[in-house]
Curated annotation (Swiss-Prot):
GO terms for molecular function: GTP binding; GTPase activity; magnesium ion binding. InterPro entries: G_OBG (IPR031167), GTP-bd (IPR006073), GTP-bd_Obg/CgtA (IPR014100), GTP1-OBG_CS (IPR006074), GTP1_OBG_dom (IPR006169), GTP1_OBG_dom_sf (IPR036726), OBG_GTPase (IPR045086), P-loop_NTPase (IPR027417). It is found in: Cytoplasm. CDD domains: Obg. This is GTPase Obg. HAMAP family: GTPase_Obg. The lineage of its organism: Bacteria, Pseudomonadati, Spirochaetota, Spirochaetia, Spirochaetales. The gene is obg. It comes from Borrelia garinii subsp. bavariensis (strain ATCC BAA-2496 / DSM 23469 / PBi).
């Protein structure tokens, strides 16, 4: 499949260490006890970790600042302050982490439970009891906590689409991608608006799918005709092919057959993939009649869903079907 790069830049900050405590023991029978100020807690570290079933970087937004917790100050009776909680940032497998300032690759997290401590928290300061000596019996100072560090990082992830939107030019693939995801594919009323694959992430009920909009496939694409040629090979790794056709056209059935023939001519592996047929533009004249003809022609063996992006018809049903098909793998 065509490798789509998901990239996001964020700032991470480790926690400050807590300050050491200045304290002296004061008890009923020991009014002038010695120093007993405890140490400050360490600041939280920032850790990137690979999480199972995480597919994208969609939980992060460009410009976000994410901070670990600060360590707590030391206390009397030589009690240490609590350590700051680590900030654990979950990422999908095969995520690269770069230093945004110098473009250096800091780490590559490839498999489940891989982790990388990108910033350590500041050390806690020493309490005043640590500074007592035979000469300095009552130190009235303690050590401040060490400051945390900050770093601008860029996360990069190469994605493989779950579902490829395939169809002739102007069938409405880009409009569909834009409707069901946050992608911004170019849309216009002329052929070959999409000149490169576009990617979108479809989120539904705490899960997500990666959807790709492939440039329009025309007759002869498998032999080098049109813009879809070099992208046919890139959809061989998708789980599902979503065949999008303009059901308002008089030659809708011919368009569908051309699409199937091009897939078959390119490779049987591609042709034999699980498919769903999307009959788009149900809001236009003759569409309902054509839709019924399509169902009759293809029979019950093919999964066919009629939609209208303009009227938002069938979109919810289509989204649910995408997830049902994807989870069947």
């Amino acid at each position: 499949m065509y490798n789509f790069k998901d990239s996001v830049s964020i700032t991470v900050i480790s926690g400050n260490g807590g300050s050491g405590c200045v304290s002296f023991l004061r008890e009923k029978f020991n009014a002038k006890g010695g120093p007993d100020g405890g140490n400050g807690g360490s600041g939280g570290s920032v850790i990137f970790k690979v999480k199972e079933n995480l597919r994208t970087l969609s939980s992060y937004k460009n410009g976000h600042v994410l901070c670990a917790k600060n360590g707590r100050p030391g206390m009397s009776f030589k009690r240490s302050g609590a350590n700051g909680k680590d900030l654990i940032l979950f990422v999908p497998p095969n995520t690269d982490i770069y230093n945004e300032n110098d473009e250096a690759l800091l780490c590559r997290l490839e498999k489940l439970n891989d982790e990388f401590v990108i910033l350590k928290g500041g050390r806690g300061g020493l309490g005043n009891w640590n500074f007592k000596t035979s000469i300095r019996r009552a130190p009235r100072f303690a050590q401040p906590g060490e400051s945390g560090n900050s770093l601008n990082v860029r996360l990069e992830l190469f994605l493989v689409a779950d579902i490829g939107l395939v169809g002739p030019p102007n069938a409405g693939k880009s409009s569909l991608l834009n409707r069901i995801t946050s992608a911004k594919s170019r849309v216009a009323n002329y052929p070959f608006t999409t000149k490169i694959p576009h990617l979108g992430v479809l989120r539904y009920s705490y899960d997500d799918l990666i959807i790709a909009d492939i440039p329009g496939i025309i007759k002869g694409a498998s032999f080098g005709v049109g813009l879809g040629t070099k992208f046919l090979k890139h959809i061989t790794k998708t789980k599902i092919l979503a065949l999008v056709i303009d059901i308002s056209e008089a030659n809708f059935l011919e368009s569908y057959n051309i699409l199937l023939n091009e897939l078959k001519s390119y490779s049987y592996k591609l042709f034999n993939k699980k498919k769903i047929i999307i009959a788009n533009k149900l809001d236009l004249d003759s569409s309902e009649k054509n839709f019924n003809c399509l169902i009759k022609a293809l029979g019950k063996e093919e999964k066919i869903i009629g939609i209208s992006i303009y009227e938002n018809r069938g979109i919810d049903e289509l989204i649910k079907e995408f997830f049902i098909l994807a989870k069947a793998f």
